[in-house]
From Swiss-Prot:
Keywords: 2Fe-2S, Cell inner membrane, Cell membrane, FAD, Flavoprotein, Ion transport, Iron, Iron-sulfur, Membrane, Metal-binding, NAD, Sodium, Sodium transport, Translocase, Transmembrane, Transmembrane helix, Transport, Ubiquinone. Its EC number is 7.2.1.1. GO terms for biological process: sodium ion transport. It comes from Pseudomonas aeruginosa (strain UCBPP-PA14). Binds 1 [2Fe-2S] cluster. Its main location: membrane. [2Fe-2S] cluster binds at residues 70, 76, 79, 111. GO terms for cellular component: plasma membrane. This is Na(+)-translocating NADH-quinone reductase subunit F. The gene is nqrF. It is an enzyme of class 7 (translocase). The lineage of its organism: Bacteria, Pseudomonadati, Pseudomonadota, Gammaproteobacteria, Pseudomonadales. It is a single-pass membrane protein. Belongs to the NqrF family.
Length: 407
């Protein structure tokens, strides 16, 4: 009798285990996609791809590159597309990025959308003009204490067909980078020593993608140029250093960098309105692209001014280029303001934060600031202060154009 009970118990246990295995297999078949699916794009292009990944990465694998400044983290909301069919329900991570109307129209973040079944999607047509290059580092010097000017040489015969104010994405591989190995010119090492920046180490286990505005303008061909600020941890924090910027700061001439692009929406309006450019820090990049494009390529007669804020003269760069542009173009003026000029600067020019300088020295006496177009790129606090000042002056939001790299 005891032996029978033992066999019965073993049999029941085995049956339960087999039943659970069957349930798991059925659930897996329903929840985990496998095999190939078809993605129809804009009703014209068709891809046959393996199921199971996210839409953003699946498209990129097939050379269809949607913009993604956060590299697929679901925070930048640049990888938007319309999912006409397939893709399942919108995820909670997507909801804050869309209005109810957009949600009903099928807008999704491609980085959050699973590829589980046949799909129909719509993307901007310009996506099909996006290309991928393996570029070579031509130079990577400091132009300010915490900003590098990275210049990449494109492969022979290649060019980036971009508009001024556009950007590309850089791909950073897994790496271990030690700040003590950075090549920082002697004139910029003081603050690196002061804040003991050399102690940081960047460890990255997977590929990272980030977006950067180009500092060159369309006629500067064969290269792409960037102004990239190191994203070091705030003092006293346990946060890791910036993944992409740490890798960029360690790049040397001859190194290879993968680039995708071009992308963009921070473009100049085709009008005759006065243009006022406002920049700070690494926000110099799209300012340079726009201003050089207007004056060198388009030979614009529009009234143009550029207001740039820096801490001290050591943090100001491209000054000789802007001096030359001002000398060559009577319709262009530029103004540098220092918020913390050093004794060695012997500075007699404008001082203070750039939004106050712009208001006190120009806009408060301007007959019609609401008729100007304002283009800006800089640290988030600068952007917020400038936007408030312009709004208080009656400038409509449609005439305030922002390259919001600061989030």
């Amino acid at each position: 009798m005891i032996g029978f009970e033992i066999f019965l118990a073993i049999g029941m246990f085995t049956a339960i285990v087999l039943g659970l295995v069957a349930i798991i297999l059925v659930a897996r078949a329903k929840l985990v996609s496998s095999g190939d699916v078809t993605i129809q794009i804009n009703g014209e292009h068709s891809l046959t791809v393996p199921a199971g990944g996210k839409l953003l990465q699946t498209l990129a694998t097939n050379n269809v590159f949607l913009s993604s400044a956060c590299g697929g983290g679901g925070t930048c909301a640049q990888c938007k597309c319309v999912v006409v069919e397939g893709g399942g329900e919108m995820l909670p991570t997507e909801e804050s990025h869309f209005t109810r109307r957009q949600a009903k129209e099928g807008w999704r973040l491609s980085c959050q959308t699973p590829v589980k079944q046949d799909m129909q999607i719509r993307v901007p047509e310009e996506v099909f003009g996006v290309k991928k290059w393996e570029c070579t580092v031509e130079s990577n010097p400091n132009v300010a204490t915490f900003i590098k000017e990275l210049t990449l040489r494109l492969p022979d015969g290649e060019s980036v067909d971009f508009r001024a104010g556009g950007y590309v994405q850089l791909e950073c591989p897994p790496h271990v980078v030690e700040y003590k190995d950075f090549d920082i010119q002697p004139e910029y090492r003081g603050d690196w020593d002061k804040f003991n920046m050399w102690r940081y180490v960047s460890k990255v286990d997977e590929t990272v993608i980030r977006a950067y505005s180009m500092a060159n303008y369309p006629e500067e061909q064969g290269v792409v140029k960037f102004n990239i600020r190191i994203a070091s941890p705030p003092p006293g924090s346990d946060l890791p250093p910036g993944q992409m910027s740490s890798w960029v700061f360690n790049l040397k001439p001859g190194d290879k960098v993968t680039v995708y692009g071009p992308f963009g929406e921070f473009f100049a309006k085709d009008t005759e309105a006065e243009m006022v450019f406002i920049g700070g820090g690494a926000g110099m990049a799209p300012m340079r692209s726009h201003i050089f494009d207007q004056l060198r390529r388009l030979k614009s007669n529009r009234k143009i001014s550029f207001w740039y804020g820096a801490r001290s003269l050591r943090e100001a760069f491209y000054t000789e280029e802007y001096d030359q542009l001002q000398a060559e173009n009577p319709n262009f003026q530029w103004h540098l303001a220092l918020s913390d000029p050093q004794p060695e600067d012997n500075w007699t020019g404008l001082t203070g934060f750039i939004h106050n300088v712009l208001f006190e020295n120009y806009l408060k006496d301007h007959p019609a600031p609401e008729d100007c177009e304002f283009y800006m790129c800089g640290p988030p606090m600068m952007n917020a202060a400038v936007i408030k000042m312009l709004t208080d002056l009656g400038v409509e939001r449609e005439n305030i154009l922002l390259d919001d790299f600061g989030g």
